[in-house]
Amino acid sequence: MARPTRKTGPKKAKKNVPSGVAHIQSTFNNTIVTISDIRGDVISWASAGSSGFKGAKKGTPYAAQTAADSAARRAMEQGMRQLEVMVSGPGAGRETAIRALQGAGLEITLIRDVTPIPHNGCRPPKRRRV
């Protein structure tokens, strides 16, 4: 019996996007880097977990650097040259991710911290007792 041929979906066309926005969400447990165009359509993304790190190693600066480098390379294949960077969260990989984006060859035009800070909003969870 002959094998059924696989149907492949339409190939994603390469966009030519010269500038965009990189969102770096850095928590204590992971770092997620998302690169989008100016309208907000995602061009590439990577996280410490998707870069092959597991468990507590996902929260390290090196894992954030690897994730940012991976996302930057994929964005540069789409023609990305300039970036605005929005950094969010208290994690260890904030600065290393920005340096990795610069090191990959992207020109950073703006760095903005968009970490949400409550103006006395919800009651925080109770303190941990270890």
UniProtKB/Swiss-Prot annotation:
Pfam families: Ribosomal_S11. InterPro entries: Ribosomal_uS11 (IPR001971), Ribosomal_uS11_bac-type (IPR019981), Ribosomal_uS11_CS (IPR018102), Ribosomal_uS11_sf (IPR036967). GO terms for cellular component: cytosolic small ribosomal subunit. GO terms for molecular function: rRNA binding; structural constituent of ribosome. GO terms for biological process: translation. Keywords: Ribonucleoprotein, Ribosomal protein, RNA-binding, rRNA-binding. It comes from the Bacteria. Coiled coil: none annotated. Located on the platform of the 30S subunit, it bridges several disparate RNA helices of the 16S rRNA. Forms part of the Shine-Dalgarno cleft in the 70S ribosome. HAMAP family: Ribosomal_uS11. Belongs to the universal ribosomal protein uS11 family. PANTHER family: 40S RIBOSOMAL PROTEIN S14/30S RIBOSOMAL PROTEIN S11. Part of the 30S ribosomal subunit. Interacts with proteins S7 and S18. Binds to IF-3. This is Small ribosomal subunit protein uS11. The gene is rpsK.
